[in-house]
């Protein structure tokens, strides 16, 4: 009952909008039973520069979901 | 005169909107003389996932304020 | 041909709007050949507090551009 | 023959007893071929506080198992 | 409603028994509103050696409690 | 279109030759859809010593591949 | 008897003289029961530059004092 | 008189019982004048897994002893 | 006479051969007075994967050269 | 107006006197527009030993100056 | 029987060839009972630059050997 | 000839004067062949507080000396 376990997987989400959207894409694209409840931890934030402008936001997140 | 000191306290702010709002809540909810001028440093960013969606943004910040 | 090098420079961008804007200012203000294509990595996020409110967002980023 | 590889997965184990039990639960609950021989590395230790008492021990571990 | 904040304080607990007891002492000795619900994070583990034997376990923990 | 995500998995490659070979083994032995294009990041480098000589090179790498 | 706890607070001391003086100011300005015996740990060292000269030394220290 | 020095050595202790026992073994097995008074700092915690069960606890500790 | 200073710049070198070659390219491509004597420090090692094979080695190094 | 940027450069200062002097030399020897107002952050402290005595203090600092 | 301990010592190996050779020199030059079986962990990689070329590879490794 | 190795040992020096003196004591008290030429790296700086005043400066340094 009180014995629980959570598995963490590391995902990089990419968005042209902003960092929050990049995180949300990382969460949305995560499959194999990680769509339920859980939490995320931001590990790294990067992005692409094209012609001197930020053109992509990239967020690496650890996504945790309960192990059944 | 030139001898100053600043105290830092660590606070986790939570918001359903975005990371900047979570940081602003951490700053706003901080009491005991920390409402004046100072600065913050982001220590950690996490969040909650419900039904496969980001439902809360959590920012841990160190908030610094002058010691009188 | 396959031998390339990228130089990274560390820049702190400041904005009254939000963290993404602070990053974009760091990228835009970077000179000496770093205006082309490349990438950035967020190193640190801080900000200023005035009268108990966040009044400036400060993002330290490493900006990478190709060495000709 | 001498070419081996090990895959690491990150798991959070939770126990009401102590940290060692939390680690053992993380190991026991790990599935997909990780039940064999291998090793674990403690990444983080946290826990829950209820009514001013520690009520749950949480250990995040990297669990390594041989890739066939 | 959804706007919450948690304050973290750093405490070193000392015990002659074991690490879990040292953590529990850190939690128990924490005052000013931190006696309610919340969580802890282990930051550091050390101890004293007397006559070649471990004679004290010392755990540094961050203790988080809700800001009202 | 611009919404992409990459999953990272952590693998330890072992080789009797050198560190680059250990990294290549980690990449080659990685399964479940990670055989396509992507990148790796070196996390840790270790090795075995037998009779005072290095007899195995071990490289821990994060291997990233696109999530379909 | 053997159950003790120490609380750590983080303080930034500023001095125009040198780093040791900045640390001593951080210790001296710390209030609420931290004036007794204990220890400090240096967390960060920074300073201000005016007209190309170091004009202020800033030391961030964790100051630990016994919890009664 | 007030001039003292302590030497730190890094030792990995292994036990089939638990982490505290692994630390105590590291302290007990340390030779060359480190058997006296001093302190230890936990650097890393790992362990072995056999048939899906934790079969050994391994604690890496820095052990400090006074230099005569 | 005894007052010296060294400037460090961060460069990413890329090679199809191996990590040492990637470091040598980073050193060779570094301009503006850094071609003299000095030293380098490896900061990060990554690489590209194409069709499941390592196709590029990338080494980030800090290159230090004397300030005249 | 409120859009500002600061560039950081990493410099190692060396002095036979003490650490503060090594930092001041790093600041003084820094060229290309970094002579104005700004700040420094200590990154590393090392030194040389000759015949069992400290003969040089070396401080690595990040020096930040406003980008015009 | 199951109570074992390993001592780690930190050694910097230098080679004009490559990083693996630098590591092997660190292992070979290590004395006082560390010539047996054990393992190493790479802690840092640096090198010397002469006339704009890499002229020495330096690897700092922790070398672990069983305590009898 | 070009094959060299340096051994590092970790020492905590204590002084009532200042940090540089604490470092010099760590270097001076180091025995077994470490009295020759080499270098040190500052790992940690702490100190004791008595009656609200800094009464001891403690510097942990890695001291490197050539292996014959």
Regions found by a protein language model. Give the residues of each.
Chain A
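A cross-kingdom feature marking charged/low-complexity
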Residues: 41, 45-68
